[in-house]
């Protein structure tokens, strides 16, 4: 605990932000992070990760286990990620209501940093799914109009790997941030990848 306090004091003293609080909690990261965020009504949790290593590739990454322990939105940042601006945010909308969970945080960031949200969805030939996607896109666009956030709507063809399609769109449009809502119905959700 003493080492954690010393490290935290060192980080806070080197920060230019003055309205920071420090809290050190003892417990398992798989429970305590989410519990603390909910106790403090946190808007988001920002967590660094090194990626899955060794047996984590089989049993699930630590980051994924922490993420599924709470309903608080997460921002996962990997080592050497440099975030200087948040001008373009990519939101991937699906037919499920769960895919809309991240929109509150993303729209808050876009409003705060005067950014633009790119709302993308997969073109669907399933009529029921297409209607749900359209309804989610309309709902989100109404919200963004109301809070005066610039946005762009785009339906994309899926070329077999939707994740790669999203990343390609992000590269082509110079995205600064991806807002992705995660919901798993798998028994071992900690094995999921994002």
Task: List the predicted regions and their residue ranges.
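Small/aliphatic-rich secondary-structure junction motif
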Residues: 1, 88-153, 175
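Intrinsically disordered or low-complexity boundary/linker segments at protein termini
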Residues: 44, 49, 63-107, 112
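Structured loop/turn residues at secondary-structure junctions
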Residues: 25, 50-51, 94-95, 158
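Acidic (E/D-rich), amphipathic helical modules within compact regulatory domains
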Residues: 42-58
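Structural beta-alpha unit
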Residues: 10-45, 146-194
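Short glycine-rich, flexible loops that bind phosphorylated cofactors or substrates
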Residues: 53-54, 98, 186-188
């Amino acid at each position: 605990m003493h080492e954690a306090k010393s490290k935290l004091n060192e980080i806070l003293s080197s920060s230019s932000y003055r309205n920071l609080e420090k809290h050190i909690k003892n417990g398992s990261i798989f429970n305590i992070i989410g519990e603390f965020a909910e106790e403090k009504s946190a808007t988001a949790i920002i967590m660094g990760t090194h990626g899955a290593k060794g047996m984590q590739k089989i049993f699930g990454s630590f980051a994924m286990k922490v993420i599924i322990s709470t309903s608080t939105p997460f921002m996962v940042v990997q080592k050497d990620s440099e975030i200087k601006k948040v001008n373009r945010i990519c939101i991937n909308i699906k037919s499920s209501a769960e895919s809309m969970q991240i929109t509150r945080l993303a729209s808050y960031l876009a409003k705060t940093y005067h950014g633009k949200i790119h709302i993308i969805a997969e073109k669907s030939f399933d009529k029921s799914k297409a209607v749900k996607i359209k309804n989610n896109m309309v709902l989100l666009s109404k919200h963004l109009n109301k809070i005066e956030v610039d946005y762009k709507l785009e339906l994309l063809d899926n070329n077999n790997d939707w994740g790669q399609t999203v990343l390609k769109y992000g590269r082509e449009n110079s995205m600064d941030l991806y807002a992705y809502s995660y919901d798993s119905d798998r028994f071992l959700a900690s094995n999921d990848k994002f």
